[in-house]
Amino acid sequence: MDGQIDKMEKRYSMTKLENRLRTFQDGVALEKKKLKWSFKVIPYQAMAKLGFYFDPVIDPKTSKLKKDSVRCCYCHRQTYNVRDCRSKRKDVLETLSNIMRQHLTVTDNKQVCLLIYLRNKLLTDYSFHMGVSDWKNDKYFSNPDDENVINLRKFTFQDNWPHSGSQNEHPLGIEKMVNAGLMRYDSSIEGLGDPSMDKTLMNDTCYCIYCKQLLQGWSINDDPMSRHYKVSQNGNCYFFQTRNRFERIKNDNDSITKNCEVSPTLGENGKREVINTKTASQRQCPLFESPPSSTGPQLDDYNEKTDISVIQHNISVLDGAQGENVKRNSVEEKEQINMENGSTTLEEGNINRDVLADKKEVISTPTAKEIKRPNVQLTQSSSPIKKKRKFKRISPRKIFDEEDSEHSLNNNSANGDNKDKDLVIDFTSHIIKNRDVGRKNAILDDSTDEFSFSNQGHNTFDIPIPTSSHLLKGIDSDNDNVIREDDTGINTDTKGASSKHEKFSVNSEEDLNFSEVKLTGRDSSTNILIRTQIVDQNLGDIDRDKVPNGGSPEVPKTHELIRDNSEKREAQNGEFRHQKDSTVRQSPDILHSNKSGDNSSNITAIPKEEQRRGNSKTSSIPADIHPKPRKNLQEPRSLSISGKVVPTERKLDNINIDLNFSASDFSPSSQSEQSSKSSSVISTPVASPKINLTRSLHAVKELSGLKKETDDGKYFTNKQETIKILEDVSVKNETPNNEMLLFETGTPIASQENKSRKLFDEEFSGKELDIPIDSSTVEIKKVIKPEFEPVPSVARNLVSGTSSYPRNSRLEEQRKETSTSLADNSKKGSSFNEGNNEKEPNAAEWFKIDENRHLVKNYFHDLLKYINNNDATLANDKDGDLAFLIKQMPAEELDMTFNNWVNLKVQSIKREFIDDCDKKLDILRRDYYTATNFIETLEDDNQLIDIAKKMGIL
């Protein structure tokens, strides 16, 4: 019984805002634990204003502690899982609205919580600037005289209403306020604004939810019904309209207007005249104008000297005989009346005497204190400037002063007169500033700084920075334009040259400026080299006889400058290349195929620099820098795609190749690890692997033919070669003649990760070859050591009799030939592997389950690299890897939208994942049954002891 009384007292005490705030601030004790509100995203001040207080409980159904439980002070219902109502946009109003909607969806037999319903509606109206709502069609508040609505209005006055000495007899008691359609002020009508403003308004401020007018500053002579009627523009409120409809009360002088009449004061001597009083500021602002009443005398003597004061909230005109009260109240009204117009002043004893009266009507004007919120109908008809001034005077929110705002607008307009309204980035001036200052802009420049956006973004997704050639060409064109704009006084054109050659005729000063611009990318030297070759080739074609003497001296200077830079860079690259301990070398027997002796044999492509030097008469690249080609090398073949020949000199820049193979990568212990790092090419099973090292992903040099040698001991040599090749190689797998090529274009991506890769099981000793790096073919033969044990003895029974190579590959044939030699070594293992060959599981199946998934993952990852490196789109990538992907897609997938295609792929991946998991579980289950069966049937104690020692049991 005492517990129930305590709960009831707690509920009644929670009607006060201070008590609700204390529950969030101090916390609540539950089962000898102190629990506090821990959600900083949900402000507890706003929760308390809405009517919630912190009340953590234990859920009786699940017996779990609800740390985010709150309770309503009106309906006393609890709301759980408040944390799930947090806004993803971190919008506080949206979060609070979600909490209130969740509170309203509590399923029980009780009526809906009208307090939370009303405050949610008011908060929504404030958020969307809806003004006065349509209460006519509202489900709960369409009838202001409904019993539940009246009880809600009474509930709002229970929190220390200052005029409730005797509720029934006092003219400002709770009953009078409720009957007038007023509610106690809460900040939900103002969007839960400034707390300091709430304290000033919470004293005796009331408002009507239908017309949203605030009333405060009550005096003992005020009538709540009369003030509400007048503030709402003589009954322009849904509350009075519904009273007339339901109670059949006529809105005339004998009903509500009669109650609004002003009682005479001592100085009037029985006169009951109501006149319209307007100050200078009120005449400028139409908000304070009220609709004319039906009756009232006309003022005859306009110049009559009478002391008139607007001091009472019942809108009566008082005589100057009120003495000190008149002076004191007039001083209080001075600040609000003179807010916009500084010329109007109210001094003590000197009241403004500009009194106007209509001919036959009397206009009653409320004071500034009465109207705290603008009427929507009036504000829509006024000008923007007046609306802004009225909003500043009426709204309780803090707004900057008119003079400050106008001053700031004048400053902004003065500063922005000569600027365009649209945001325009002047890249020309930016490049000039970058050249002079020597610093880069983190946004306009593709910076590679540690904290730059470009570097962080590409590192996060493991995507290389886009450094395609046409991007650099755009930079070059910008630089060229800047230089020509700066150096307008210098003659840069060759008068006698044709228009084709004029773009290469630049002066030496421009080249000096150009050399200071840093190219973005890792291989800027390659771009400079290509630029040098193009310039040299075009300069060599100029008819120098037609060039005047004035323009000829500048061309050699430019030519020599670019040549010096390119020679230095190529010399450094050449020295670095010759200092390598081991480079890619080919044996003559691998380079040629016995299929035919003509040009259809395997060919190693000649470097593109050599081809350019052969075509250009004035090449600036020294001959000693290029690697010397072998004598047997012939002219490379260009790949034929759909009947079109791709030019052999087509080259994609900025693809830096650097991939190293170490001797440890070819060890047998890393065989299982290599299965998860396989090549990203999606093609037919691998035959004799040919690693085609090329810088271009578009023009892949397809080497025809496949070397067919007899299956003898020549395949197994004791040579060991450590092959170090460069990064991002393009691996092209070829198939025998009896197999059909899956990829006809020859352009699937096979770029490896920036790590050392293992190709085969064996180790190779290093040799150095003079094969050109950027276009060479290396064929690697498998080397088997006789003493090599391919799988540890403990797991040999899981892999014997299986092959990790494709069924029709030549490596599979080599594996079969060496199976006899490996069988002798396998017999030397422990007897743990004997007698279990009948039920041994297929270990290669385990290692190959994820092979296809890795291939697809690597393929799309490399495709993304390709797109970023070359800025590939369907418009400019006619025969590249992106176009290859689209050509290989089924017709039904091409007709799908992107979202449907992604959903289809996600579903297929899910199904494949479930199938792979089932396969792995079957393999593990098989292994477990095999091992347990072997241990249970083993009778040799020594073998059991050995197995226990190996497993770490003994």
Curated annotation (Swiss-Prot):
Task: Spell out the residue ranges that the record assigns to BIR repeats.
Answer: 20-117, 153-241
Q: Which residues bind Zn(2+)?
A: C208, C211, H228, C237
What biological process terms from GO does the record include?
Answer: apoptotic process; attachment of meiotic spindle microtubules to kinetochore; chromosome segregation; mitotic cytokinesis; mitotic spindle assembly checkpoint signaling; mitotic spindle elongation; mitotic spindle organization; negative regulation of apoptotic process
Q: Which keywords does this chain's UniProt record carry?
A: Cell cycle, Cell division, Metal-binding, Phosphoprotein, Repeat, Zinc
State the disulfide connectivity: none
Annotated Basic and acidic residues bias: 556-583, 809-818
Q: Which residues carry this modification: Phosphoserine?
A: S477, S508, S552, S587, S751, S765
One cellular component GO annotation, for this chain's record?
nucleus
Region: Disordered, residue numbers: 375-419, 541-645, 661-685, 798-839
- Report the InterPro entries cross-referenced here: Baculoviral_IAP, BIR_rpt
Polar residues: compositionally biased ranges? 593-604, 819-835
* Gene Ontology molecular function terms on file: metal ion binding
Question: Where, by residue number, does the polypeptide cross the bilayer?
Answer: none
* Bias (Basic residues): 385-396
- Has UniProt tagged this entry with the keyword Metal-binding? yes
Q: How does it assemble?
A: Component of the CPC complex at least composed of IPL1, BIR1 and SLI15. Interacts with CBF2/NDC10. Interacts with CBF3D/SKP1.
Q: What does this protein do?
A: Component of the chromosomal passenger complex (CPC), a complex that acts as a key regulator of chromosome segregation and cytokinesis.
Quote the protein name from its UniProt record.
Chromosomal passenger complex protein BIR1
